[in-house]
């Protein structure tokens, strides 16, 4: 009888401990984060692509939360190029899709939300997706920016080497 009366509280304590551990694990998730080195490598790859295609661009790389990790304007880029690249990167990250898709959605009237949510639905930015998870975005000031961003993603994250010019 005495053993049984001790087992009931011990079982209850063990159950509460297990439940607390399971709950704590449910409150945390792992998040992939683009590193400074990864963002710099993307900028370098995009710059190389732009030089091969005789373009002068600016580019911005954001992390999953929208924080600026890396930004660069090539010599001779327009005065507003950095702002344009940053706005495009923010838009691609918020909507989790290329800004060219957003542009089509807005132009056809399917969804006008990007126009009044301070987004910039102009072609030139892509979300950075690694293992199915959006870890950031890259915005490029040019209308060909998505090609440049894709080249950077391919070089840095897919390790396919230098992509050919379009």
Predicted feature locations:
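N-terminal signal peptide c-region/cleavage motif recognized by signal peptidases
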Residues: 19-21
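Flexible, solvent-exposed loop/hinge segments and secondary-structure transition points
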Residues: 24-166
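NTP-dependent nucleotidyl-transfer catalytic core
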Residues: 16
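Bacterial N-terminal signal peptides that target proteins for export
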Residues: 1-10
